[in-house]
UniProtKB/Swiss-Prot annotation:
Main subcellular location: membrane
Single GO cellular component term: plasma membrane
UniProt-listed PANTHER family: POTASSIUM-TRANSPORTING ATPASE A CHAIN (PTHR30607), POTASSIUM-TRANSPORTING ATPASE POTASSIUM-BINDING SUBUNIT (PTHR30607:SF2)
Listed GO MF terms: P-type potassium transmembrane transporter activity; potassium ion binding
Lineage start: Bacteria, Pseudomonadati, Pseudomonadota, Gammaproteobacteria, Pseudomonadales
Protein family (similarity comment): Belongs to the KdpA family.
Transmembrane segments: 7-27, 67-87, 135-155, 179-199, 258-278, 286-306, 382-402, 420-440, 487-507, 528-548
Record function comment: Part of the high-affinity ATP-driven potassium transport (or Kdp) system, which catalyzes the hydrolysis of ATP coupled with the electrogenic transport of potassium into the cytoplasm. This subunit binds the periplasmic potassium ions and delivers the ions to the membrane domain of KdpB through an intramembrane tunnel.
Keywords: Cell inner membrane, Cell membrane, Ion transport, Membrane, Potassium, Potassium transport, Transmembrane, Transmembrane helix, Transport
Designated name of the protein: Potassium-transporting ATPase potassium-binding subunit
């Protein structure tokens, strides 16, 4: 590594952490309906949305009403997007005259984007019209992220409220999250990307002649507006097939840096939003410390692994400087590895290089980031939800060790809360191990693997881990566009999304009804170094031990077999 590489890592951390406290405070004020500097502009738009839809933002909902509203909204979005993808050949803004999607692929794509997963078994420039990209996928990029933010706010209210039977209003939370939290930042980033050279037009594809004399079609389209929210909303689905490795999607080192920062910016800010809700910023600092520790450990391991010389090339006597297979030279090894860690630490899934080409242990870091439940920053809203669940599990374990009824911020954790926590622990194993085992045991679906041996198993394991974790990235050698995998991965995506959201809302409703007991000297502190250590170990044990056998069969076996 050179000085530039260290400077890149430092710039990434500074740009990520410096604005996070301010944004966190802003998001808190926005979601609670307080007046902000954007209110004169967006306030009339917000009120118009309520008037047109007949929503009273002051009418609060119980956790069940909140959940039903969320499910109804997501179902409607799925149906509309599925129909749009199937019928895109008949719809306008399709200058390339692309036909409608095959039904299983359309089903998978709709499920993927509605749930903020953005798993893509297609190439955007060859499969989707501008209308499908702009009205179908980009809209879902906004509202799926807003859904996650709304669920987080509901959980924050459940923890902070006393003897309450309501969690807020889903429709108001969705509207505020979209208008105030996501839209303004996305516009700023989109303008920056256009300045850097990302297309934003409705032009036909351009036929060009290469230096070698071959014909080439250069894709166009409204890319910048979709790419900005794909990063900020931790969606990750690329406008073009190779995602942010494409020179039109990520043309410069500056666009690479700011797209990289935007992956984790809102999740980092929401940690401070949580502190404002519970009126204790020490909780935010503890959670952020745990997230940063896990991120930096994963980044260090991944960078070390990726800079190891290839044993096969050593035997051949080839001089090695940096492994560039599957990487864009304009980003280099460090820029690609840093992105792979950030995109899997969040439920983003965008890539600026091919994860399939990472060295085995670097690929394992990406897998582990997802297997722990996308809690290392995680997706917008849902990532912090997962981290708070791990906080409650750590508190429960601490209570068992000291022989006291576990409590968090004055709320006692009793049998009902523990049952809900256990239910969320089953989500990743069911989606990854059960569905993945079914796919691996059948000869037809297993044929999607392009590489025999441990790496082929890693390809399949990565696909089902990514789907269940609502990440969306993939080892590119896995041929996912079959009816079986389209439907099975859709099921994994559904389990991974709503298997977390519904128990979280039920938990929020249960906690909201509890009274808050004053914390005494015997209360277990949840803001010191001891608790941060306990929380980190809990995350690694719950995620690591569950999936250790599969990791041993995949990336660990590959690492050993290659002679690293």
């Amino acid at each position: 590594m050179h000085s530039y590489d260290y400077l890149l890592i430092l710039a990434f951390l500074v740009l990520l952490l410096a604005p996070a406290p301010w944004l966190g405070r802003f998001f808190y004020r926005v979601m609670e309906g307080e007046r902000t500097w954007l209110s004169p502009v967006l306030g009339p738009v917000e009120r118009a949305c309520y008037l047109i839809s007949g929503v009273d933002p002051k009418t609060e909902q119980s956790w069940k009403q909140y959940a039903w509203a969320l499910l109804a909204f997501n179902l409607a979005g799925f149906v509309v997007l599925f129909a749009m993808l199937m019928l895109q050949g008949l719809l306008p803004l399709n200058p390339q005259q692309l036909p409608g999607m095959e039904w299983s692929l359309a089903f998978n794509t709709a499920m993927s984007f509605v749930t903020n997963t953005n798993w893509q078994a297609y190439s955007g420039e060859a499969s989707l019209s501008y209308l499908s990209q702009m009205v179908g996928l980009t809209v879902q990029n906004f509202v799926s992220a807003a859904t996650g933010l709304a669920v987080l706010v509901a959980l924050c209210r459940g923890i902070s409220r006393r003897s309450s039977h309501s969690l807020g209003n889903f429709w108001a939370d969705m509207t505020r999250a979209t208008l105030y939290a996501l839209l303004p930042i996305s516009i700023v980033l989109a303008v920056f990307l256009v300045w850097q050279g990302v297309p934003q037009n409705f032009a036909h594809y351009i036929d060009a002649l290469t230096l070698q004399g071959a014909d080439q079609s250069l894709p166009m389209g409204p890319a910048a507006s979709q790419i900005s929210i794909k990063q900020l909303g931790t969606n990750g689905g690329g406008f073009f097939g190779v995602n942010s490795a494409h020179p039109f999607e990520n043309p410069t080192a500056w666009s690479n840096l700011f797209e990289l920062v935007s992956i984790l910016l809102i999740p980092a800010a929401l940690v401070f939003t949580f502190g404002h809700y519970v009126k204790d910023m020490r909780q935010s600092r503890a959670i952020l410390g745990c997230m940063l520790a896990l991120l930096l450990i994963g980044g260090a391991v991944s960078l070390w692994a990726e800079y190891q010389p290839n044993p096969a090339l050593n035997i051949a006597g080839v001089e090695q400087t940096a492994p560039l297979e599957g990487k864009e030279t304009r980003f280099g090894t460090t820029g690609t590895v840093l992105w792979s860690v950030a995109t899997t630490a969040a439920s983003n899934g965008s890539v600026n290089g091919m994860h399939d080409s990472l060295n085995p242990l670097a690929g394992m870091v990406a897998l582990v980031n997802m297997m722990v439940g996308e809690v290392i920053f995680g997706g917008v809203g849902v990532g912090l939800n997962g981290m708070v669940l791990n906080v409650l599990i750590a508190v429960f374990l601490a209570g068992l060790m000291i022989g006291r009824t576990p409590e968090y911020l004055g709320k006692k954790l009793q049998a009902q809360e523990v049952r809900l926590l256990v239910a969320t622990l089953l989500v990743m194993p069911v989606g990854v191990l059960v569905l993945g085992a079914i796919a691996a045991s059948l000869p037809g679906p297993a044929g999607a693997i392009s590489n025999p041996g441990p790496h082929g198993f890693s390809q399949l394991l990565y696909a089902y881990t990514s789907a269940t974790a609502n990440n969306g990235s993939a080892f590119g050698g896995f041929s996912a566009n079959t009816v079986f995998h389209n439907l099975m991965l859709s099921l994994a995506i559904f389990i991974g999304r709503f298997g977390y959201i519904l128990p979280v809302l039920a938990l929020a409703g249960s906690l909201a009804m509890k009274k808050t007991a004053p914390q005494g000297q015997n209360s277990f502190p949840t803001h010191g170094l001891l608790f941060v250590t306990l929380l980190t170990v809990t995350i690694l044990l719950v995620g690591g031990l569950t999936f250790l056998p599969t990791l041993a069969l995949g990336p660990i076996a590959e690492h050993l077999s290659l002679g690293f």
